[in-house]
Amino acid sequence: MGTFTLHQGQSNLIKSFFRNYYLNAELGLPNDMELREFALQPFGSDTYIRHLSFSSSEELRDYLVNRNLPLHLFYSSARYQLPGARDMEEKAWMGSDLLFDIDADHICKLRSIRFCPVCGNAITSEKCERDNVETLEYVEMTSECIKRGLEEARNLVEILEDDFGLKPKVYFSGNRGFHVQVDCYGDCALLDSDERKEIAEYVMGVGVPSYPGGGENAPGWVGRKNRGINGVTIDGQVTIDVKRLIRIPNSLHGKSGLIVKEVTNLDDFEFNEALSPFTGYTIFLPYISIETEVLSRNIKLNRGVPIKIESSIGIYLHLKNLGEVKAYVR
């Protein structure tokens, strides 16, 4: 049984789903895309292709569909004079957007299981000695955890708008959290890493004192502290990095098959199948027996027993390592 291999990018069926999506996808590209570095992780590879440059959406689409189909797709938060240069100094940095990353799994304690895809047994090590294969890990993302991440995004937006006068945009990351982005020009774009660190620490509540009185409706941190908000849980390194890569809006996340989607109304966001572009049904073959929450639905899988299920769910389960999509059923 040692011949078993698995890679998220090995399935030709999954590749066909992604390729068909990118044939017509309207990617959310910046209006200065010719100044941005593009990067991607292609199917069948663990490494990124970087230092790409495109001048139009048509040129980018042709590259993605006909040359390197992406499992993950990015552009740089930075603008460069020569974005395609391989040397970072040669690129000549011109400024960057301001980014914040909220990972729901940093907020919640999530259920995870490591298992052998051949025998289906739960195994704590990275290899199943009996079947001589690498084990896989599944982490259950719940709707409740996503809701908590959304609340963090809501608090962050309030701080950026009220305390800094900025106009942030919120994006569902396509997997387990939210990205908050401020399109920066002028002085904002030229903030260095130290200045961005100060902003990150401010929104995290680092060094912000408690203020007596004022009530919950008081402005700024006075009101927030009285509402029990002591800071926003973000990945500070993302904000500090002036050359960070951003997932392209309306691209697909290769660990879920869900769309990286702008959330224009935080009250309307739901973690469900509508985040997937895939329609129809698939035949899914589970590696293990498990009951789990998937896109706000409870799903029961039995090891080795094929199940007909919506493509949105089947592709999600496949990319989460729980089994394989074996066929597409219209």
Swiss-Prot record:
Cofactor(s) annotated in UniProt: Mg(2+); Mn(2+)
Signal sequence residues: none
Keywords: DNA replication, DNA-directed RNA polymerase, Magnesium, Manganese, Metal-binding, Nucleotidyltransferase, Primosome, Transcription, Transferase, Zinc
Coiled-coil stretches noted in the UniProt entry, renumbered to this chain: none
Binding residues for Zn(2+): 116, 119, 128, 131
E.C. designation(s): 2.7.7.-
GO cellular component: DNA-directed RNA polymerase complex; primosome complex
Active site per the UniProt annotation: 101, 103, 235
Protein's GO biological process: DNA replication, synthesis of primer
Transmembrane intervals: none
GO molecular function, one term: DNA-directed RNA polymerase activity
Family: Belongs to the eukaryotic-type primase small subunit family.
Reported function: Catalytic subunit of DNA primase, an RNA polymerase that catalyzes the synthesis of short RNA molecules used as primers for DNA polymerase during DNA replication. The small subunit contains the primase catalytic core and has DNA synthesis activity on its own. Binding to the large subunit stabilizes and modulates the activity, increasing the rate of DNA synthesis while decreasing the length of the DNA fragments, and conferring RNA synthesis capability. The DNA polymerase activity may enable DNA primase to also catalyze primer extension after primer synthesis. May also play a role in DNA repair.
Subunit structure: Heterodimer of a small subunit (PriS) and a large subunit (PriL).
Annotated protein name in UniProt: DNA primase small subunit PriS
Organism the protein comes from: Saccharolobus islandicus (strain M.16.4 / Kamchatka #3) (Sulfolobus islandicus)
